[in-house]
Amino acid sequence: MIVVAHLLDALFPEGHDIRVDGALIHGSARTGAAESVAVIGTANAAAVDAALALSLVEHLLAVLDGPPRPLVLLVDTSGQALRRHEELIGLNAYLAHVAECVDFARRSGFPSLSLVYGQAVSGGFLSFGMMADRVYALASAQIRVMDLRAMARITKIPHEELVRLAAESPVFAPGAENYARMGAIEAIWSEPSSLLLNAALAELLGHQAVAREDHRREFGQLRGGRLLAARTVAAIGAAR
């Protein structure tokens, strides 16, 4: 398990002013590629509830009140909070609000990249880290939409069959490597590195117009992990 303090020191050796308040990471840092980056994220395998979602949005909107600068989103989440209270108050709308704010930042001149350094599960990942212009992951990261046993209970497909399918298709399989094959992850880092972060930021800042385009389906086709998405979108576009 990555200790957040060690992660921050490895990513931002030029210095940072970042706080970890329970499950919330927020602050600013200096990098070799940008004088100032805003850093927002989750820690301790946080289950994202309505309160945490609003805290993420609060810090995102505070950054947007200032001059444009890159956003670095750090991801360690066990997914959305699975509590009756959260469902009753409409947690899905809170998560949608987080996704909208990250997307609004992207379209407002705040280029973003996310780094999965711990867990990345379900809605906690989809609404935040996966919304960035570029998504990276440490090799040790645990990425999945749903545990195969939970998937078996819901779909009524035997667990053994899902294990077999996961071995054949990255769509069913957890892990950073499988998400990279599907195009969801830009690249996998063996360890947290300021050199890798600076290179990723430099690429992002040098090609901001391209960065705002979503090429994940093309990456999925090139890497052999998602073969139909790009062709389907192209066919729909050609039929207009």
Q: Where are the language model's segments positioned?
A:
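Short, hydrophobic/amphipathic alpha-helical packing segments
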Residues: 53-61, 95, 129
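N-terminal short beta-loop-beta anion/metal-coordinating cradle
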Residues: 15-34
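Conserved catalytic cores of soluble enzyme domains
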Residues: 83-197
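Short strand->helix junction
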Residues: 45-46, 80, 119
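STAS-typified acidic loop motif
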Residues: 7, 28-54
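A structural preference for short, pocket-lining loop segments at secondary-structure junctions
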Residues: 36-41, 55-84
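Amphipathic alpha-helical segments at domain termini/boundaries
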Residues: 1-16, 154, 158-240
